[in-house]
Amino acid sequence: DTQMVTVFKTKYIERLREYYFVGGMPEVVKDFSEKKDYNRVRAIQKNLINYYQQDFSKHAEIKLVPRLNLVWNSIPMQLAKENKKYIYGQVREGSRAKDFELAIQWLLDCGLIHKVQRIQKPDLPLKAYIDFDAFKLFLVDIGLLIAMTDLDAKVIIEGNKIFTEFKGALTEQYILQQLISDVGVIPYYYSTQNSKGEIDFLVQGKTSVIPIEVKAEENLKAKSLKAFCEKYQPSYAVRTSMSDYREQDW
């Protein structure tokens, strides 16, 4: 019921921002549902993050542990970039894929991060057009991502004028979690070789590829999505934002 969504829009946005901060880790959600205390939320999240990093030392080979920490700690910084493609050289200067591939795979196998591969050609089947050298990394939970940045609850819940670019990263993290919660959906992303005109997510429908453009607020300008639709003519496209629901043609 889109009219109902519009009527309760302000309340829904408040709850969404609350979820951004709290996230979905069971221990955090349980405590927040009982105490409604953002300080307790942050303390539990920090404990979870420390626990995960202690697990690196317990379960991974000793020589791999420093690289696990470097990859893990680099994810918020990598997502803060306008171009969110994972860059090895920004983890450690001069690094290449071979330096961190095992660490990334270890974190993937443990379910602590999600990997979104670039698609070279938005055609069916998407798996046939994966660019294995280009990808984005996201954390398992949006609340943990915010905790790793030390952003205060007030910035997330009430908003802040200087909190702009990273807001886009949080929105992508949230949309990713919603996509992968649907069994069988594998999100990818698309960009041209020069990285201009990126489509935040691509998913494979039964008979077509569905592009998804992610907007953090109500700005509906979507040059990349428009150009993509004009070139590839998908059956339909999706643009998420804080704006009211609408259907439109280009």
What do the PLM-derived regions correspond to, one by one?
Residues V65, G94-A97, E165, A169:
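Short, solvent-exposed loop/helix junctions and linker helices
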Residues V91-R96, G143:
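Conserved Helicase C-terminal RecA-like lobe
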Residues L102-W250:
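A cross-kingdom feature that marks ATP-driven nucleic-acid transaction machinery
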Residues K81-E82, A97-K98, H114-Q117:
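Phosphate-coordinating catalytic segments in nucleotide- and nucleic-acid-processing enzymes
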